[in-house]
A protein has these predicted regions:
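Conserved beta-strand-loop-alpha-helix hinge in the C-terminal portion
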Residues: 217-240
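Hydrophobic anchor residue at the start of the ABC signature
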Residues: 151
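H-loop/switch region of ABC-family ATPase nucleotide-binding domains
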Residues: 197-198
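Catalytic Walker B motif of ABC-type/P-loop ATPase nucleotide-binding domains
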Residues: 162-165
């Protein structure tokens, strides 16, 4: 369960980023923060996970309770044991190069017995059917695969709350679909999910509520049923993107005029990533 009430203004900023914002998310529910860039979605998540004020400086007022525990005075690591954070670019939160070691990293910092860590890591890959990602170089994985590893790392810590900041920002359609399956699994396990997102269609079957933010405030809270029932005009009025993938269209581009006989020419180019066998490009 998440309960919060905040006001926050970044150091050197002229205006507050959050204005008397508050909310309550019952255990096992999924809430999606949506709204335009700069509306305060990421700032709200930072206030909840302790990055504000422990990493990002500014004037913070209010409170946050995670599963009934007041986070005031807690070290950021203690907050992390209550709520796991997953960021836009998982590379920014990796501490090791090996995927299995990355999942084990947080458990090692808790000082758990080696056998307990081994079992928990094995369980993480098995529960989510991601054995193919074991013992891989994280920098040879796709963006989607790296995002999955970051979620496994969070799950291995056995937290009940997951905070995800635009988790599909760097993902393609296939990777987004894989992430959706992981989030569905977390929801079935009774985890509490709070996400900030621009891309909403993949959350149509996961989210319980959509909270629309603007100017550092929550302007509207809508159930998934209400959000799905909105017309295109209603969604545009409240700045809510479509939840139906069929409504998303890609405009056709007109071919560029030829300004020269040859725009780009290459020959005899070969490239291989790291130690990967064979040529990646030839």
């Amino acid at each position: 369960m998440i309960d919060f009430e905040f006001e926050f203004q970044y150091a050197e900023a002229k205006l507050p980023s959050l204005r008397q914002i508050g909310g309550s998310i019952p255990a096992g529910r999924c809430v999606v923060l949506c709204g335009g860039s700069g509306c305060g979605k990421s700032t709200l998540l930072r206030c909840i996970n302790g990055l504000i004020p422990q990493f990002y400086e500014g004037e913070l007022k209010g409170f946050c309770r995670l599963n009934g525990q007041d986070t005031a005075g807690m070290h950021i690591g203690e907050i992390g044991e209550l709520a796991a954070s997953v960021f836009q670019d998982p590379r920014s939160q990796f501490f090791t190069v090996n995927s299995s070691n990355e999942v084990a990293f947080g458990l090692e910092n808790l000082g758990l017995p080696q056998e307990t860590i081994r079992q928990r890591v094995e369980e993480a890959f098995r529960v989510f059917h991601l054995e193919r990602l074991k013992d891989r170089n994280v920098y040879e994985l796709s963006s989607g695969e790296r995002q999955l590893i970051s979620i496994l790392s969070a799950w291995a810590m056995d937290t009940d709350i997951f905070l995800l900041d635009e988790p599909t920002a760097n993902l393609d359609f296939v990777a987004t679909r894989q992430l959706k399956e992981i989030l569905l699994a977390l929801k079935r396990q009774g985890k509490t999910l709070l996400l900030s997102e621009h891309r909403l269609y993949y959350l149509a079957d996961i989210a319980d509520e959509f909270w629309v933010m603007a100017d550092g405030e929550i302007k509207g809270e809508y159930t998934a049923t209400e959000a799905k029932a909105f017309s295109a005009e209603q969604r545009q009025t409240i700045s809510l993107r479509t939840l139906d993938l069929a409504e998303i269209s890609v405009p056709e581009k007109e071919p560029l005029p030829k300004t020269a006989a040859t725009a780009l020419a290459v020959s005899d180019v070969r490239y291989t990533y790291g130690r990967k066998a064979g040529d990646t490009l030839s």
